């Protein structure tokens, strides 16, 4: 595992951070696929850079593999419903919990720019 190359504690630490940060408390459900999350790494610049670089390299490789595997998959109506439900969960998280969104809205930021990441369609059940 790439994280272990840098520290035996990184995967466990950043997986927990991901699970905790991206949890929808009002629904009692996790978001995402359970990978890692971190921000504001300020331990050692060179080591932090090497770790972030390796995360990017691994992500790029894995993303290409996923796309290659799924690129020819035909979408069904059921798939679109699932996608829009997940988009709805993203909207909930972004507006209720995301630190960046909250900060931008509370400090008079450009609302259109802040909300630009919201999906064009979403569903709630």
Question: Which ranges hold each PLM region?
Answer:
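A domain-level signal for the structural core that forms small-molecule/cofactor-binding pockets
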Residues: 1-125
């Amino acid at each position: 595992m790439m994280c272990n190359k840098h520290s035996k504690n990184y995967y466990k630490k950043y997986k927990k951070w991901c699970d905790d940060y991206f949890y929808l408390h009002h629904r009692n459900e996790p978001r995402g696929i359970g990978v890692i999350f971190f921000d504001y790494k300020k331990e050692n610049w060179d080591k932090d850079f090497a770790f972030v670089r390796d995360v990017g390299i691994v992500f790029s490789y894995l993303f290409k593999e996923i796309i290659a595997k799924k690129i020819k998959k035909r979408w069904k109506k059921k798939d679109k419903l699932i996608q829009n439900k997940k988009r709805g969960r993203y909207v909930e998280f972004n507006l209720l919990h995301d630190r960046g969104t909250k900060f931008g809205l509370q400090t008079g930021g450009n609302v259109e720019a802040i909300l630009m990441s919201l999906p064009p369609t979403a569903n709630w059940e």
